[in-house]
C-alpha cells in the first residue's frame, strides 16, 4: 500500500499540467472577457481600429457577444467541463486575434517606421495599450496551452 506521504501530489505530471493549463486559460479568459463585457464601447472602438470589417452592426454584435463567449469558455475550463471543446474555441480565438494583431502591427511598422517591438496599441484584449511583441508572446503561450488541452487524451 502506497503512503500519501511518499507521493505528496496525488496527480501525475500530465494531469497536473492539464490542470494548470485549464486554470491559467480559464482565469485569463474569464477576467479579460468580463473586462470587455463591462466596457463594450471601449472594446468596440478597439475592434473597429483593425479595419477588417466596416459594418457597424456586425462589429456591435462582436463587441456584445465575444466577451461572453470568452467568459463562458473560461468558466468551462475552470470547472473542467467540456474542456477540449472550450480549449478548441479558445485556440481559434487566440489564433485569429493574434493574426490580426500581427497584421495591424506590421502595417504600423511599414507606415511609420517604428521598431516592431516598440509598437504599442490597444489590441482590444481588455488591458489598454500594450506592446505588440509582448502581446504576441503572451498569446503564443496561451495558444500553446489551449492546443495542449485540445490534443490531450483525457476528455
Segment roles from a protein language model:
Residues 2-155:
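Membrane-interfacial helix-loop segments of redox and metal-homeostasis proteins
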Amino acid at each position: 500500500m502506497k503512503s500519501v506521504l511518499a507521493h505528496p501530489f496525488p496527480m501525475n505530471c500530465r494531469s497536473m499540467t492539464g490542470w494548470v493549463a485549464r486554470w491559467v486559460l480559464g482565469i485569463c479568459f474569464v477576467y479579460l472577457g468580463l473586462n470587455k463585457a463591462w466596457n463594450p464601447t471601449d472594446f468596440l472602438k478597439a475592434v473597429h481600429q483593425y479595419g477588417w470589417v466596416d459594418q457597424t452592426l456586425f462589429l456591435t454584435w462582436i463587441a456584445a457577444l465575444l466577451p461572453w463567449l470568452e467568459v463562458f469558455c473560461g468558466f468551462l475550463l475552470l470547472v473542467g467541463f467540456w474542456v477540449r471543446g472550450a480549449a478548441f474555441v479558445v485556440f481559434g480565438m487566440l489564433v485569429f486575434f493574434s493574426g490580426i494583431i500581427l497584421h495591424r502591427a506590421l502595417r504600423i511598422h511599414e507606415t511609420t517606421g517604428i521598431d516592431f517591438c516598440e509598437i504599442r496599441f490597444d489590441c482590444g484584449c481588455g488591458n489598454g495599450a500594450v506592446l505588440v511583441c509582448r502581446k504576441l508572446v503572451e498569446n503564443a503561450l496561451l495558444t500553446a496551452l489551449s492546443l495542449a488541452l485540445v490534443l490531450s487524451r483525457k476528455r
